Design a protein with these regions (language model features):
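Bacterial N-terminal signal peptides that target proteins for export
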Residues: 1-12
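C-terminal motif of bacterial Sec signal peptides marking the signal peptidase cleavage site
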Residues: 20-24
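A residue-level marker of the well-folded mature domains of exported/periplasmic proteins
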Residues: 25-326
């Protein structure tokens, strides 16, 4: 636990420096007491994945003294109304948690020039909009590499959610990571078309297992839990995409390859308080400590497998390994 908090503190410092911020903590915390911050989520904070870590980021912001609010399970068609509701309530900062919200957020933000918007996995940068890009492909690459190191059937599977850029990129990274380890491996990649059909994800995962997959890897928010459950029920291995997913697959889960977006949210908010927000879209991945390997749940994972995966993580962080997203 101590190491966990040391790592989190280090990540926040790295990201704060990425935003060009080194200002007095007392000033930031004093300023934060008068700030209202909202988070609009496409899914549920109970997903043990993307939305859960976003919410954890909001809690970090709350701990700095801000007044916070959040809205879960927001369809794109309702995002503009959610923005306007927070604007009417006097919110100063609005985080949009999904690439799916980009177009509606960019358009609606024009109505509220005094509100600062942060878009996740977006390429938009306007007067009152800043974006940072979580490197989902790196998470997928690590999942694929570990799956290839663990498989006994030479067949591994990735199940994504809605086929938006982050999930598509995660699937591309997964395939390239698996083939980085074993160019001859069989890789199955399929997206669900949604993030909340847990039963459908379980059925698809069981279909994968019937086709020879013995390591399952989800990147589907709430639906990821169905993939983990399928692994538990069929006796294959699973690599989680979020902390705590092992609770639904205690015998199947090997480890989580984590996207700890919470520290990115906190760093973005600190940049707002300091009034020093770079215009360019900032990458948030292995180099920034946002993508990392969690604690292993199984004691029988060979040390050489762990060492190989750590080496791949370092090569992603240094840029030695490049992922092709074309």
């Amino acid at each position: 636990m101590k190491n966990k908090w040391i790592r989190i503190a280090t990540l926040v410092l790295v990201l704060v420096m990425s935003f060009g911020l080194l200002v007095a903590c007392d000033k930031k915390e004093e300023d934060a007491k008068n700030v209202k911050v909202a988070l609009i989520l496409e899914g549920a904070i109970s997903d043990m994945s993307w939305n859960a870590t976003a919410y954890n980021g909001l809690l970090k912001i709350k701990n700095l003294g801000a007044t916070v609010g959040h809205t879960e399970n927001t369809p794109v068609s309702s995002a503009a109304d959610a923005i306007r509701a927070y604007a009417a309530d006097g919110y100063d900062v609005i985080f949009m948690s999904s690439n799916s919200f980009q177009d509606v957020a960019v358009e609606t933000a024009k109505e509220f020039p005094d509100i600062q918007f942060f878009l996740i996995n977006s390429g938009a940068t306007e007067d009152n909009i800043r974006s940072f890009a979580i490197q989902d492909a790196e998470q997928g690459f690590l999942m694929g590499a570990l799956a290839a190191l663990l498989t006994e059937t030479n067949t591994v599977g990735f199940i994504g959610g809605l086929p938006i850029n982050p999930i598509v990129n995660g699937g591309k990274g997964f395939e390239q990571g698996a083939k980085y380890v074993n160019p001859n491996i069989n890789v199955k990649v399929q997206n669900m078309g949604n993030f909340d059909d847990v039963l459908g994800a379980k059925e698809l995962a069981k279909q994968f297992v019937s086709e020879g997959v013995d390591v399952l890897c989800p990147m589907a928010n709430q639906a990821s839990l169905g993939v983990m459950e399928a692994a538990e029920e069929t006796g294959v291995l699973a690599i989680g995409s979020g902390l705590d997913q092992e609770t639904v697959a205690p015998n199947a889960a090997v480890v989580a390859i984590v996207k700890d977006t919470a520290v990115a949210y906190e760093a973005a908010y600190r940049s707002y308080l300091a009034g020093n927000m770079p215009a360019e879209v900032l990458p948030m991945g292995a180099a920034q400590g946002v993508i990392y390997i969690g604690d292993y749940y199984k004691d029988d994972i060979p040390q050489d497998v762990k060492d190989q995966l750590n080496d791949i993580l370092q090569k992603l962080a240094s840029g030695e390994i490049k992922i092709n997203l074309d």
